Amino acid sequence: MKRLLLSFLFTVAFGSCAFEVGEDELCFVGDSITYLWDLEYYFPNYITHKHAVSGAGLKQLDSWDVSDCKGRTTILLIGTNDIGYWKSTADGIERLREDYKDRFIKSAKRIGGKPMLIVSILPRNEWGKQDSLVNENIRAQNGVLRRSLKDIPDWEFVDVFDLFLDKGLQIREDLFKDGLHPND
């Protein structure tokens, strides 16, 4: 599944001219999902910079030195560790979504990637123990991000959320090894 996701990103990036002609370096920033990507395999003709740590969220990202991403095409996939346990029925959920969106934009701007491809937060069912309310919330948070990022120059929100779903808001079990990390 990682191949499908990365191929999709590559197609979107080139289809929307996100990669500059002659560009030879790409930056990837994220959590364990990004950490597990074999960038040398998927992008053999590029020098890649990877800033990704298992369990990372925005708080951790804000402490990383990502200065090598400034001005470079950057792919950002982070968020499941920040909001992956929220339920859409939680008290104050709208305030939480707006606060997360503001922190997300601030963190992404600090990276300084140009252009910036922001990948939607993926659905999940970690070890088969989460209910679909978690994915309902992730879908809603992706919507907040999509609407908020659309007018930021040189940023593209790449929504792959539905590609990972089966019926309803259940994940496609065949695409995840543990309900969280996409298969190879």
Model-identified regions with their sequence ranges:
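Repetitive helical segments and hydrophobic/amphipathic motifs
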Residues: 11-12
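Serine-esterase "nucleophile elbow" of acetyl-processing enzymes
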Residues: 7, 16-74
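Positively charged n-region of N-terminal signal peptides that target proteins for export
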Residues: 1-3
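Alpha-helical cap/lid subdomain in secreted, periplasmic
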Residues: 42-47, 62-184
